[in-house]
Amino acid sequence: MTRRDFIGTAGATSTLLQAAAAPNTEDRRNITTGWPIPKEGYVDQPYVVITNDGKWLCVLTTGSGVEGKPGQHIVATISSDQGRTWSSLIDIEPANGPEASWVMPLKTPYGRVYVFYTYNKDNLREVAGCNSPALAKRVDTLGYYAYKYSDDHGRTWSHDRYYIPMRRMRIDRENLYAGKVLFFWGVGKPIIDRGRAYFGFAKVGKWGNPGTMVQSQGCFMRSDNILTERDPNKINWILLPDGDEGLRAPKGPVSDEANPVALSDGSLYATYRTVDGYNCHAYSRDGGHTWTPPAYATYAPLGRRIKHSRAANFVKKFSNGKFLLWYHNHGGESIHAGKWEPYANRNPAWIAGGIEKDSHIYWSEPEILLYDLDPATRMSYPDFIEENGKFYVTETQKTIARVHEIDRSLLEGAWNQRDNRTVAPGGVILEPPFAMPRLPSLSGGGFTLDFRIRFRELSPNQVILDNREASGKGIAVTLTDRATLHLSLHDGRLRSEWESDAGTGPGTLEVGKWHHVAVIVDGGPNIITWIIDGVLNDGGAVREFGWGRFNPKMEDINGTPTAKVAPALFGELRKLRVYDRYLRTSEVIGNFHAG
């Protein structure tokens, strides 16, 4: 027997397992299934609080033009049915006044709702000295930190507005106005912990090109009495962190949109975005006065970095003490090798589930939360709502904002990944003569291949699975000359392909090691992902993306009824399962842990 003839199939049984659930005709992850939130034209940051009368109060920034145009202002709307329908818009600040933007709500225990926002109080019409004539006309990210309140659950708002004193820092003194005009905006929705309220925001230094907010640092406001003090003139405020510097990135000049949560021991954890190809995180153990040094966010302490573009990367804590991170799962060092558009590729939205351990957050491998069939859609600025055991998320694409109910099992799966030892149901384990189960059309359907493999060498052109016809129609999994696994899809008309990560990092191939491998073909967002040894490939050091899109026009990729399984493999293959559905990341990790 030559090495080309050898294949190990230990543990193979030909059993069709019961399907996990009946097919779902509506994919909740598709953003078009959500419920629209009213707006004027442009719409941003649809943030929700549940008021003491049981209704949802959503506040948002809107305007008849595009982002940053005159007439941009802040409004409220109310829902009595968990976001399915909404009231007419209620002005908090009018469209005919100075720009009012980036509104964030806080509900006090006694029922008052405050909103905090950037207000162009002095009605400046141009940013002097800006290097872009177009951006010089944009005056929605400067002025004063203002707030108003409502004592009737958002139906009416105080006539008076109040202002938070803002301590100048180095980044302010170095702006175009030497700190006499402040540039800032906030997206870090207020949180409450131990009788204090916090919210996050970014101070802006240089304004203009490239990127509009050329320099920024993360900061926080804290009030120790806003939850009980009913005279808004007596509310105290502390700008954090102490000193002259805010939260910064390890390399680049951008540290935007700090977003805080509280840990069980009173520590604070914050995420913020950069232009470095990763998001950042920081911990404070003293109520926000000081923070850990600049560091890219990692899935676990000293673990691999979380790739992310210049987009919202929000963290949320739920009543069960667990966390959720919204991000976009691409970036890395490879972005610096060529031209990169940091504001692009906000579709799909990914989440990681977080658990607290030893005063740190450990993040799960990512899952797709939301997608749009148009890759250019840019969904962002979410808010998460929890009510009566159900979970919801809001998001905006700048011209449409929606509410979505989240499948609770998606979140539970992410939170429980580390302990999951269950084999995902619905798989067929192939055994001789390797009759290939029929796969669904990729037009809305999907499939997963799941197997264990050990290579004696990583030479190219090894074949793990192949059911292609002479015309090429079918699927194949092979090994490339980069020591990566390669999936080929062909429906007789169109061909798509994607391969696993190269290199030596987590989720890559080694000689002599048993690997658990899954490749997921998801016909909802039309995305292929590789998961190797419980690590969802993120592109590693070489690629910006570890996940790839396949042609959305692909349909029937069934090839020959009998597959060739390991006809040219220098190694062993075990437990090759074929699923006629996409598996969630958490299901694949359950298979990995199950052994």
Task: Give short role names for the model-derived ranges.
Residues 16-21, 196, 465, 549-553:
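Short, intrinsically disordered, charge-balanced linker/junction segments flanking boundaries
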Residues 16-17, 21, 64, 94-95, ...:
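A short acidic/small-residue loop/turn micro-motif
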Residues 5-21:
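N-terminal export signals
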Residues 420-595:
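Extracellular glycan-associated modules
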Residues 1-5, 153:
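Twin-arginine (Tat) signal peptide motif
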Residues 22-422:
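Asp-box/BNR beta-propeller blade signature and adjacent active/binding-site loops
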Residues 8, 293, 590-593:
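Phosphate-coordinating loops and pocket residues in cytosolic domains that bind phosphorylated ligands
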